[in-house]
């Protein structure tokens, strides 16, 4: 997935799942399964349920995404 093709949306983490996966509810009400991006994993950025995050979605699979930013 090229970065230009990604769709960026905001959401709220609903649930933490095994293997650094999270269930995220987007602003439009949809729920997606998202994993942490490599840079966030490298710098040990913690994500907890209730955190507001920025998620990148692939145009090919809108049910899976990558968490790229945790908002303060």
UniProtKB/Swiss-Prot annotation:
Q: Which GO terms describe its cellular component?
A: cytosol
Keywords of the record, alphabetical order, are: Cytoplasm, Initiation factor, Protein biosynthesis, RNA-binding, rRNA-binding
Protein localization: Cytoplasm
Question: Cross-referenced Gene3D superfamilies, in alphabetical order?
Answer: Nucleic acid-binding proteins (2.40.50.140)
The UniProt GO MF terms for this protein read:
ribosome binding; rRNA binding; translation initiation factor activity
Q: Please list the residue ranges annotated as the S1-like domain.
A: 1-72
Matches recorded under Pfam families: eIF-1a
Respond yes or no to whether keyword Protein biosynthesis is given for this record.
yes
What job does the chain carry out?
A: One of the essential components for the initiation of protein synthesis. Stabilizes the binding of IF-2 and IF-3 on the 30S subunit to which N-formylmethionyl-tRNA(fMet) subsequently binds. Helps modulate mRNA selection, yielding the 30S pre-initiation complex (PIC). Upon addition of the 50S ribosomal subunit IF-1, IF-2 and IF-3 are released leaving the mature 70S translation initiation complex.
HAMAP family in the record: IF_1
Q: Which family does it belong to?
A: Belongs to the IF-1 family.
How it assembles, according to the record, is: Component of the 30S ribosomal translation pre-initiation complex which assembles on the 30S ribosome in the order IF-2 and IF-3, IF-1 and N-formylmethionyl-tRNA(fMet); mRNA recruitment can occur at any time during PIC assembly.
This chain's protein is named: Translation initiation factor IF-1 1
Annotated organism of origin: Nitratidesulfovibrio vulgaris (strain ATCC 29579 / DSM 644 / CCUG 34227 / NCIMB 8303 / VKM B-1760 / Hildenborough)
Q: What's the encoding gene here?
A: infA1
């Amino acid at each position: 997935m090229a970065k230009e093709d990604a769709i960026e949306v905001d959401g709220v983490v609903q649930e933490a799942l095994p293997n650094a996966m999270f269930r995220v509810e987007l602003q439009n009400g949809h729920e997606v399964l998202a994993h942490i991006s490599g840079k966030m994993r490298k710098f040990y950025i913690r994500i907890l349920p209730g955190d507001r995050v920025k998620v990148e979605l692939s145009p090919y699979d809108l049910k899976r995404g990558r968490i790229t930013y945790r908002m303060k």
